[in-house]
Amino acid sequence: MEMNLLQKLCVVCSKCNEYAMELECLKYCDPNVLLAESTPFKRNAAAIVYLYRKIYPEVVAQNRTQSSLLTLYLEMLLKALHEDTALLDRALMAYSRQPDRAAFYRTVLRLDRCDRHHTVELQFTDNVRFSVSLATLNDIERFLCKMNYVYGILAPEAGLEVCAQLLELLRRLCGISPVARQEVYVEGTTCAQCYEELTIIPNQGRSLNKRLQGLLCNHIAVHRPSSQSDVNIQTVEQDLLDLTTRIPHLAGVLSALKSLFSSSSAYHSYIQEAEEALREYNLFTDIPERIYSLSDFTYWSRTSEVIVKRVGITIQQLNVYHQLCRALMNGISRHLYGEDVEDIFVLGEKALDGEERMFVGSVFAAPNRIIDLITSLSIQAFEDNPVFNKLHESNEMYTKIKHILEEIRRPLPDGTGGDGPEGEAIHLRGREAMSGTGTTLMTASNSSNSSTHSQRNNGGGGRARGGGKKVVGGGVNGQDGDGSENGLRVRNCDEHEALDLVDARSRIHNVTREVNVRKRAYLQKVSEVGYGKVIRCIKTQERLTSKLIDVNLVGPLCLDFISKLMNGFLYRSQYHQDQDVVDVGDQFTYDEHLYVVNNLIHKSLPVESLPLLGQQIYELCNGPLFTHCTDRYPLSHNVDMAYACDNAGVLPHVKDDLVKCAEGTVYPSEWMVVKYMGFFNFSDCQDLNVLQKEMWMHVRELVLSVALYNETFGKQLSIACLRDELHPDRDVILTYNKEWPLLLRHEGSLYKSKDLYLLLYRHLSRPDESGDVPTAPVAKPSTLTAAAAVSGVFREPDRPWLPSPYPSSSTAGVSRRVRATRKRPRRASSLLDLARDEHGIQDLVPGSLR
């Protein structure tokens, strides 16, 4: 089956991406190796030159007609590949004449100049213009959201020019590599897609701005974790099998690499023993109490392992691994090229200290291995602090599991296998540790008695601290042990008399022990909460470190936004030079404008229609980026407009002005603000906010006037905007252009005008939307019907007006407010009757119709 054009473009784009990744890697290689192995590079360079000459002009022409994400990316990639290939070729030629590695790298990496900054000029009118500086992908995305907000007041020519500049800046920022450079994006700055994702999940009582703070964006630069964390030494050894026989010392380096990570730690090896013991029990076997405790402790130990990830690598192992890989590479290079490799990584290591090397990483180690090492070192530094030594629960958990295993293995003297009192005590201790409450009720009076006597033998210290006087009922006067003998005898007697009372209370509850148990439980709870917060903080920082160190690809968001905006501007400008579009301003004058206005100015819209009309106002005020109203499960237009305003950073009071404008009013005198032939003419505006409000009022007048026109004349005109495509089923089309802001599709023709009411008069001058002449029976032909057959509807200007043989709405005595008269087909003369009152005053009728 033959591929279509889109599939062929995808194949070309895939091959270009493959070559782009290879070319990007060549920039960091040793130039001596490149000169020795330059044949594949020259062959690929010739292919790129051919593709650039053959495909690039066609892709550019396609994007100036109708763009897509694929064609925009291919245009950007082909030009970048052509430039970088020529640059690398020139750098290699210069290096061959004068070997200087530093100069070579400065040339191919463009370190001597910075072209990653651009200033965009936006001009709305002669008096309103702005300059915006852009430097990162986040700046471009935010600027595109602002362009979407002002889409209706920006000329299509200016919009296309700005989009071309943004595409050029994207090419300079991204280059040929799909991997985004760290200096071209800000990971802590959110985008429009982050905003939309947060709007569809529960907010838990937090505002959207607070939820956006601290969020890592994964759309501008998409995080792609490396799939292979450990280097397969066996695969490397198999690839170097031929060289191993010719280079004697390679075998020793490979064996050292294999043995470096092969030794597994025996730390907490009894966890496997516990799991082996648990395999002997299932649903239909008798399960002892200690097995329940062992199962619970094993579960919590696994949960702890998920929270605190142990990494089986140290920084010393990573350094040794890096040195061994470097020795392996240099050994192969000396055998093939006669010298060690001195690429940009070797030159850069000399300028970095230890911590900087760790964050930069190693060319031989996967990024996630570095991330795991940093996380492990962070947790270890936290646990080594003496203040937090006891907060780490994992060692305590493993110790409990070990003790239970020892009790299971150790036979008791009664031969019960640990089911005696000692085993029960272990079970109780395990349940107490699992519950964490520490609340204990005394069930034996001996323990309470011994506790009470121990308190009394301490010289009455417990009573002196607040409880003694209440116990003896006033018999204790608070004296110390150095009082008189009589006083001592009285006190001993009182204590003996109150002994039964204190003992009875102690049987009920032991206050001292309860306080100690609750104190320990509280400290344990504080430790758990504090440790959990620290671990969550470390995990958050781990995600940030992963975003910084791991691979991040350039996301498609910016190109997608540019494509949508370009298509919108292209649709707005495609009918500018069309000769088939008829300008109604050449046919009608101010009289026709006044005719329609006077027929609408005294009417009013139904109040119940305002909410639906407000949604249409939001639709026409919005740009092409946020169009969730067309989704499978569509959102309302006010939600799309809210997305556009929030992502553009519109101030709250400006949003309130937009809402008040969209709410509308039922009286035409309050919304008819546009002058004759002045629709979408904002040349008098001196400020962007005023310009935006004027645009909203023009859109409101369009929507409400067309709705009132349909209500008054019984029509069904619909409105669309040139935002994505020209709707063939819509009648009135808003183009947002100053020269011809409105189009009317009617009876197979396309009309344009700068005045809304002239277009409505053009539509009104036909009997109905389909263009069929009414077929009501006529008694006998007259001059009017003959003229109507020739001219379509109206008489010639020099002919006198003759009354219609059919009764009009005024002659029938029917009020203009009665809607039933508007639904029946009208003759030509009934249009004139709408402009006359019952007294026959004809001042509102245009002169050409009298």
From Swiss-Prot:
ATP binds at residues 709-716. Pfam families: PRTP. One of its GO terms (molecular function) is zinc ion binding. Transmembrane segments: none annotated. One of its GO terms (cellular component) is host cell nucleus. Associates with TRM2 and TRM3 to form the tripartite terminase complex. Interacts with portal protein. This is Tripartite terminase subunit 1. It comes from Human cytomegalovirus (strain AD169). The lineage of its organism: Viruses, Duplodnaviria, Heunggongvirae, Peploviricota, Herviviricetes.
